[in-house]
A protein has these predicted regions:
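Glycine- and small/polar-enriched repetitive beta-structure motifs of secreted/surface proteins
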Residues: 1-294
């Protein structure tokens, strides 16, 4: 053992001695190094080399001021960083990494908790097994959740928030463009500002069950098996389609397939309510297929 002033050393092959004599070192176990003021290394093969650093367990490294590394081969390399677990890494100042192979990889103030959780940007938060928050200020919570853009939020199993300031909440949702929102199970929002809420929606702006809205912004599909597929379209109900600019369809088994068409009503299986360009169709199995007809 090598012992410096006002230090405590117990065990074998420990080192608390520095060139510029420090004080208050504690090394207990085998092959530990505690070489800055008020450092603590307990266990085997630990290194506490930053001022006031603490390394506890097996082969952990706390190399920056007031850093803490605990577990097995954990590393805390940023000032006031905390790394706890097996091969966990807290890279930058004020980072926290807790869990098996959890890691922070960017410039500071990030948190990764859970097996193989990764916080890959400043101010990012990753919670859950294999979660990944790689955007600045992003949040990923849940198993395999991923927030890959700045300010993105993904919460739930395999949910992905890939657009800036996008939100994905639930199971296997995908918000792929800026400012999109998906909530529920298996929803996708593919264009900027889109909303998909419910089950298996593919949406620009949709709420419901198995609805589709795409191509442009300002679309709404609400209900089940609906499609709003052009600019400023609205589809509400079941098996409703609004496919041209400004079209509105409400009810069951309805097609508003003309520009600025309005179709409202219901139809039995095998039938439809239809409206053409600038046309209005209202009622059971109503059809206004001529331009500007009612």
């Amino acid at each position: 053992n090598r012992v410096s002033t006002n230090s405590i050393v117990v065990g074998y092959a420990n080192d608390t001695k520095t060139g510029a004599q420090g004080n208050g070192h504690v090394a207990y176990g085998f092959g530990n190094t505690a070489t800055e003021d008020t450092t603590t290394a307990l266990g085997g093969g630990n290194k506490a080399t930053g001022p006031a650093a603490t390394a506890i367990g097996s082969f952990n490294e706390a190399t920056a001021r007031a850093s803490v590394a605990m577990g097995n081969v954990a590393k805390a390399t940023g000032e006031k960083s905390i790394s706890i677990g097996n091969y966990s890494v807290a890279k930058s100042n004020d980072d926290i990494a807790i869990g098996n192979q959890a890691k922070t990889t960017s410039t500071g103030d990030s948190i990764a908790m859970g097996r193989q959780a990764t916080a890959g940007n400043a101010n990012a938060l990753a919670f859950g097994a294999e979660s990944n928050a790689s955007g600045w200020g992003s949040i990923a919570t849940g198993r395999e959740a991923a927030a890959s853009a700045n300010f993105a939020t993904a919460i739930g199993y395999q949910s992905k928030a890939n657009g800036s300031a996008s939100v994905a909440i639930g199971k296997q949702n995908k918000s792929n463009m800026a400012d999109t929102i998906t909530m529920g199970n298996g929803n996708t929002a593919n264009t900027m500002g889109g909303i998909a809420i419910g089950l298996n929606n593919k949406a620009d702006s949709s709420i419901g069950d198995s609805t589709t809205a795409n191509k442009s912004n300002l679309q709404i599909a609400f209900g089940r098996d609906n499609e709003a597929t052009s600019l400023d379209t609205i589809a509400i109900g079941r098996e409703v389609k609004s496919t041209k600019t400004g079209a509105v369809a409400m009810g069951s088994r309805i097609n508003a397939n003309g520009d600025y068409a309005v179709a409202i009503g219901n139809s039995s299986a095998g039938g439809t309510v239809e409206a053409g360009d600038y046309a209005v169709a209202v009622g059971f199995k109503a059809k206004a297929t001529g331009g500007r007809s009612i």
